[in-house]
């Protein structure tokens, strides 16, 4: 899976004004869990709180906040036919301006989450290694393909780290504890 922190850093660098949209309560059947979050700028979003009308309403409220309409918003949204979302649960959303402290906290947490992902090492970047790396890159894993042939490492899936080395066994010694 692509590392979370670099795209987050890029988003924050490009957006001087950002609202944090957080699921503060999720009851019943909901698209995302309590604690899920996304960021909204005047012209872009990062992340998701579940999509659909719920997310559209939250984005609109976040952009209103960014436009100076209040200092914090709370939304209590029943997910039913009234809004065209069939989940059936109820979600409370908190929306606030992401100041420098909150931005740094989000980045620190993203880096910690990236580092905590399990590490998977694939030895060989041929057709099997490429297929495995493509499948594993979709999961919350740190995937590395270790190979002795430079051309076998070309065009690996996004988020897959590659290592060209004449002695692949050395990568085993460098692997974090618990790697597969």
Q: What positions do the PLM features span?
A:
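Segments forming oxygen-rich coordination pockets for charged ligands
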Residues: 1-164, 178-180
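Short amphipathic alpha-helix with an adjacent loop that forms part of the alpha/beta core around
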Residues: 168-178
């Amino acid at each position: 899976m692509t590392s979370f922190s670099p795209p987050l850093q890029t988003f924050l660098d490009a957006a001087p004004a950002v609202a944090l949209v957080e699921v503060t309560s999720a009851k019943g059947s909901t698209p995302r869990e309590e604690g899920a979050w996304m960021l909204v700028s005047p012209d872009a979003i990062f992340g998701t709180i579940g999509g659909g009308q719920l997310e559209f309403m939250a984005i609109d409220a976040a952009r209103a906040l960014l436009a100076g309409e209040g200092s914090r918003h709370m939304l209590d949204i029943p997910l039913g036919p009234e809004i065209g979302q069939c989940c059936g649960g109820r979600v409370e959303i908190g929306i606030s301006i992401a100041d420098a402290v909150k931005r740094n906290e989000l980045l620190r947490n993203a880096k910690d989450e990236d580092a905590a992902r399990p590490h998977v090492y694939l030895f060989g970047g041929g057709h099997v290694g490429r297929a495995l790396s493509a499948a594993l890159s979709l999961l919350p894993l740190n995937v590395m393909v270790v190979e002795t042939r430079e051309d076998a490492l070309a065009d690996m899936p996004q988020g897959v780290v590659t290592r060209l080395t004449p002695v692949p066994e050395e990568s085993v010694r460098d692997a974090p504890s618990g790697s597969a």
